[in-house]
């Protein structure tokens, strides 16, 4: 049963475990994404923050949230998580409602490297979003088209080596848009630009 965007967004708020996974830190009206990274040449991790202003409504999920032991809980508790493809995930998934459109942004934080594994992380996160969408549809009948894009943020000193001639998308996966932290921090969520949009129906 297709429902309107507001209704589906309300359903996401109701069904997701927001008490554990939702990002609620704000700074001057902007949502704060925060993850520990190792800056170039450093052996000590620091909190890397990206502040994004929001138009419409946003539900920010820290998919890689650590528990009390410093590890991430399995995303699917009924499945063996050891070395399985569903054990991978990106750092953040943002559900963003603007009018009658719901966008989904999968975001991975990296430091001074852009390893091949980040492609697997973002692909696994897309699969998680599809699984979530399917689960809600099967159990409740509620459905709404989602528009998904994938991003990696980094402080790589020379990212051009890994990017297309325009310096935007990964050579290994053209659907993943790259931004430097310094270029995106403080901008609007609407500023995230990716022409490769996956539809989840």
Each language-model region and where it sits:
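Long, contiguous, structured domain-core segments that constitute the functional module of a protein
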Residues: 85-93, 99
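A structure-centric signal for secondary-structure junctions around beta-strands
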Residues: 89, 101-103, 147
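Short, flexible beta-strand-to-coil junctions
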Residues: 95-103, 154-158
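Conserved catalytic cores of phosphodiester-cleaving nucleases, focusing on short active-site segments
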Residues: 92-94, 103-111
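Domain-level recognition of nuclease-like catalytic cores that cleave nucleotide substrates
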Residues: 139-201
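Short acidic, S/G/P-rich loop/turn micro-motifs used as interaction or catalytic elements
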Residues: 111-115, 157-160
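Acidic, metal/cofactor-coordinating or nucleic-acid-engaging core segments within structured domains
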Residues: 82-87, 114-147
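Acidic-basic catalytic patches of nuclease active cores, encompassing PD-(D/E)XK
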Residues: 1-83, 199-201
